[in-house]
Amino acid sequence: LQFHFHHPSEERVNSRGSAMVAHLVHQNTAGQLAVVAVLLDPGESNPLINKVWTYMPLDKGDSVRMPADLLNLNELLPTDQRYYQFMGSLTTPPCTEGVLWMVLKQATPIAREQLKLFSQLFPNNARPVQPANGRAVRSAQ
């Protein structure tokens, strides 16, 4: 469906947040939503991020289409693809409930320069971490 980024991350793994997160939003034919959250922490430069930043919108709310042949989201995924799974809500209005979340346990590296560019254009565009409210969080592979 779409993907977007938040700075800082809107998720915590073992009470630790990440510098950024990429949300890969999926929707099935019944309209049900699932989001894969890829945590991003300072490290090596990420080649996919370089491509995406070239097409990054400069104003909040703008939508940009990147040529499909340039976009291989596998380049964003960490080697270890184990994840936590829970039912939650979208993190942007209207914050709809009933969303299946899969938060990857291992962060993907992003260069400090890549992080700095995003954070200058979109400072603190993250929703505060929400309480679990009794939601079951399970570890999956």
Predicted regions and their residues:
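Extracellular or lumenal secretory-pathway regions
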Residues: 1-19, 23-141
